[in-house]
Design a protein with these regions (language model features):
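An amphipathic alpha-helical core segment
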Residues: 269, 273-291, 325-371
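Long, contiguous internal "core" modules enriched in hydrophobic/ aromatic residues
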Residues: 225-331
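Membrane-proximal, acidic/low-complexity disordered segments on the non-cytosolic side
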Residues: 67-98
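Gly/Pro-rich turn-and-neighbor structural signature
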Residues: 97-181, 298-333, 337-353
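TerminUS-proximal long segments
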Residues: 358, 363-408
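Internal mixed beta-strand/loop scaffold within catalytic domains of large alpha/beta enzymes
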Residues: 143-232
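Mature, function-bearing regions of proteins
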Residues: 158, 162-191, 237-241, 281, ...
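N-terminal mitochondrial targeting presequence
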Residues: 1-61, 71
Length: 408
């Protein structure tokens, strides 16, 4: 008779009555799978087994299961942080009108950054350097900088997205302006996203311009929104004042504001004049624009406020591009360039001494310092006890900065 394989010999051996192992009777009582909340249904099973038979069954069952588990994709546990949840949402469904506002705002400012960069590259003729960066605890951004271009001595546009946790003292401080923040929590997850931009042209006849629009949100433990608010604005800082430029800039911004609320422009223009003010110099940084902060549910619902912010940001290109196109190639003297440097020095003073956004960024753990200081000009100057000549163009600018004007 042909030799049997080892598996056949093992089966015959286990089946043979002459094979004697200590046998054990095994009884089990359990409940069948059921959605019923009633008493357990009993079932009793009796198995006569030998140790060798049990080992064979175990090996045959566990080995394929272990192999299958090794092949399977790892099971993803629920994301533990707000940043993880948002990253998962973007992977699974992208960003659309039903997405959380924080993701919609991030998408919008990234799109606007790309549009503005493309238009400024058209005006200047040179390309921006673009740096993508990430924060260790979630978030990141894109910093676009053009230095020593044809039109812009320095131009920077930065998108920043920050996830973090507010400690108890910060919660109590913020709750003064936002009552929907839960004061009982020891810490609260937060999200902040914004687009910041500063353009410093070479030509002293062309004005510096600044823009910032941002969104802040605190979140419940399940990731839903708790408190939210928008902030932002834009403003013009000329070295030489052309009334027609100031009127065009303010008129364009006013139109965006008026489409939502007729009170917005006068209110936010006044706020801008007061905020961008060098207290130690006794003069405004520039000729203003609009500025607002903490726009939350006490003003308008979130959708309407988001729409307002979108319109303001979209108004930037039509408010500034006609001005830079008109002024970028005007002739100027060395003395006029020196005056521009002195005005830039005042700009630097405000940003480093008074600006809350700069202070917030520099004091946020894990922040990107290069992006925060992107707003500073490539060159600036200071002279001891310098005063412009009476009745000069330089003096007229200082007069307006000391007594802000209504342009529209």
């Amino acid at each position: 008779m042909a030799a049997r394989r080892p598996s056949q010999r093992l089966a015959a051996y286990l089946a043979s009555p002459s094979t004697r192992f200590p046998r054990t009777q095994f009884a089990s009582t359990g409940r069948w799978l059921s959605s019923s909340a009633g008493p357990k249904a009993s079932r009793t099973s009796y198995f006569n087994y030998s140790p060798l038979w049990l080992a064979a069954v175990a090996l045959g069952t566990v080995a394929p299961l272990a192999y299958k588990m090794a092949e399977m994709e790892p099971i993803n546990a629920d994301p533990s942080t707000l940043a993880d949840r948002d990253a998962q949402k973007k992977r699974e469904s992208g960003v659309n009108e039903d997405s959380p506002m924080r993701l919609r705002m991030e998408k919008f400012i990234r799109e606007q950054q790309a549009l503005i960069v493309a238009e400024l590259e058209r005006v200047d003729g040179k390309k921006f350097r673009k740096d993508e960066w990430e924060r260790p605890n979630g978030g990141g951004g894109t910093t676009c900088v053009l230095q020593e271009g044809n039109v812009f001595e320095k131009a920077g546009l930065g998108v920043s997205v920050v996830y973090g946790s507010l400690p108890k003292p910060a919660i109590e401080k913020m709750r003064a302006n936002h009552k929907t923040i839960d004061p009982s929590m020891e810490s609260i997850d937060f999200f902040a996203a914004g687009l910041s931009m500063v353009l410093h042209p070479y030509n002293p006849m062309a004005p510096t311009v600044h823009l910032n629009y941002r969104y802040f949100e605190t979140a419940n433990p399940d990731g839903t929104s708790q408190a939210w608010w928008f902030g932002g604005g834009c403003d013009l800082t000329p070295s030489y004042l052309f009334d027609e430029d100031a009127i065009h800039f303010h008129k364009t911004i006013k139109a965006a504001c008026d489409a939502h609320d007729k009170d917005y422009y006068p209110r936010f223009k006044k706020w801008c004049d007061e905020y961008f003010y060098n207290k130690h110099r006794g003069e405004a940084r520039g000729i203003g624009g609009i500025f607002f902060d903490d726009l939350d549910e006490t003003e308008r619902d979130r959708e309407n406020t988001f729409s307002f912010v979108q319109d303001c940001l979209k108004a930037f290109l039509p408010s500034y591009i006609p001005i830079i196109e008109k002024r970028k190639d005007m002739p100027y003297t060395e003395a006029e360039k020196d005056w521009q440097q002195l005005r830039r020095g005042k700009y630097v003073e405000f940003n480093l001494v008074h600006d809350r956004g700069t202070a917030f960024g520099l004091n946020t753990p894990g922040s990107r310092v290069e992006s925060i200081l992107m707003s500073l000009p490539l060159t600036a100057g200071w002279k001891y006890m310098h005063e412009p000549e009476p009745k000069s163009r330089e003096q007229r600018l200082v007069d307006v900065l000391r007594d802000p004007k209504e342009w529209v």
